[in-house]
Amino acid sequence: YQSECSGIYTESYKKLEAMGLVYPCFCSRSQLHAASAPHTSDGNVVYPGTCRGLTAEEIAEKRKKKAPAYRLMVPDENITFTDGCMGEHTENLLRDCGDFYLRRADGVFAYQLAVVVDDARMGVTEVVRGADLLSSTARQLYLYRLLDLPAPKFAHCPLLLASDGRRLSKRDGDQSLENLRARYTAEDIVGRLAYAYGLQEEPAPRTPESLIKDFSWDKVPKKDICLPEGLFE
């Protein structure tokens, strides 16, 4: 899919490049982790700006040894937005994230740029996704602003965890949606998940349409939810 949209991503990338905000980075992941830099909430390293000030001569010398990835310079400023589920959220891009990747060394465009360009191109006005992507939002809002694109409204839902508090994973033998659909009707699955999220008092079958009239983000918990024991036997 990304290969089909490469031209669109390149156009946006070149706009950022023309602003003087893009620079080559030669740091490896292992080097960054070894530097004991602070970590972001999603587990990544806060980039310390190691390659931000390289001279043209230094860049040329480093290119002889490896192809660079490319990062976007971020300002030392707070970006605040109101999340539909989590409420007001503030992040300082420089301190909480650092300059972030726009393009990998192999030429593939990074998620942050691709998702912004894709959503704007498709006219997306509301984004509902997992709370594990909350920390990406400030970066994306910064890109929307630089590219002069309309930003959607965001709502980040708490994650549904296994009953013992770990992330659900096929590798650990947890239920996949595919397996559940083989044993339950769609209404059964929706109703039980609605119960787990506190949207109804018992795990009775429901359709998404029947939940809409009483839905409010205020009813959705702000913290991750452990799947009730025995909900899906």
Predicted regions and their residues:
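Active-site cores that bind ATP or allylic diphosphates and position pyrophosphate for catalysis
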Residues: S30-S169, S176-L180, E229-E233
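Generic recognition of stable, solvent-exposed alpha-helical segments in well-folded globular domains
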Residues: E11, S135-A138, D188, R206
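Non-catalytic terminal extensions that flank enzyme cores
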Residues: A60-E61, E77, R166-L168, D172-E233
